[in-house]
Amino acid sequence: MTIIKSKTLKIDYFSYIKAFFNLMKPRVMSLVIFTCAVGLLIAPEKINFSNAVFSLVAVALGSGAAGALNMWYESDLDSLMTRTCLRPIPTGKLTKNQALVFGITSSIISVVALYIFSNLIAATTLLITILFYVFVYTVWLKRKTPQNIVIGGIAGSLPPVIGWSIATNSISFASISFFLIIFFWTPSHFWALSLYKADDYKKAKIPMMPLTEGIEKTKLYILVYSLLMLPVIILPYAINFSGLTYLLPAIMLTIYYNFICYDLYNYKKNNFDLKKAKKV
């Protein structure tokens, strides 16, 4: 009897921890860690290894905190959508209050920790990122305009700037150039996602581009934003921050991305191919 109870407690405890981990949007968090680490590594100044690791952990926690607050606010929408109905709050694994407390607490800890292990500029930029994602994107824009992805993309584009500021205690045009690359990539990627998740967004009454402007215009906007990446991708080279070892592969990859987006656009009018959309 005791053994059975012990096993049950272990399983429940593990499930509880897993629920909080999923609340932090681990996929998004991993992308944030990666882009922040890139910003940190390409910066001209270096910090010691332990500070770099603790700083990245703080940024990861900040990203997770923003994700938790997003799920807290959008739990009503998440329960309506196939893509999100298995998240911790809709499934009852966590309550809204637990998500709110966790999100606020983690936000504070992450910003304070980043200030301790790096500097005020990095910590302030992280704070701005969290606040922008939660209040500007989640609360204000997402339910009101199809431009939610464009403006809200500012938050998702800031991690390289944070990484750069961790190492240099500054924000430069070089770090902003990498911010712009992610900023112009974001709309095309997420509008492609919204094409094949349109039914989900319709259920939740989220005004994504395919629902407000139609499939054809969405495909056009995807192509336009992918083409805008070409001049932006050249910026690090144009400001003498990077050399040809960056420029040539970057241009080749961007042209390939342009081709993928054009392939999606060139499909049947007012229709799209699922495989082509998923490639974007």
Language-model features: locations:
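Cytosolic, membrane-interface loops and tails of multi-pass inner-membrane proteins
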Residues: 2-15, 73-94, 191-218
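Membrane-embedded alpha-helical segments that form the functional core of polytopic membrane enzymes
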Residues: 34-75, 107, 111, 124-136, ...
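C-terminal ends of transmembrane helices
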Residues: 76, 132-145, 190, 196, ...
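Interfacial loop-to-transmembrane junctions
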Residues: 258-280
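Structural signal for membrane-spanning alpha-helices in multi-pass inner-membrane proteins
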Residues: 36-43, 110-117, 133, 137-138, ...
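Multi-pass membrane catalytic core of lipid/isoprenoid biosynthesis enzymes
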Residues: 83-124, 214-238
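Small-residue-rich segments of transmembrane alpha-helices in multi-pass membrane proteins
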Residues: 34-37, 87-90, 150-167, 216-217, ...
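Intramembrane alpha-helical segments
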Residues: 96-167
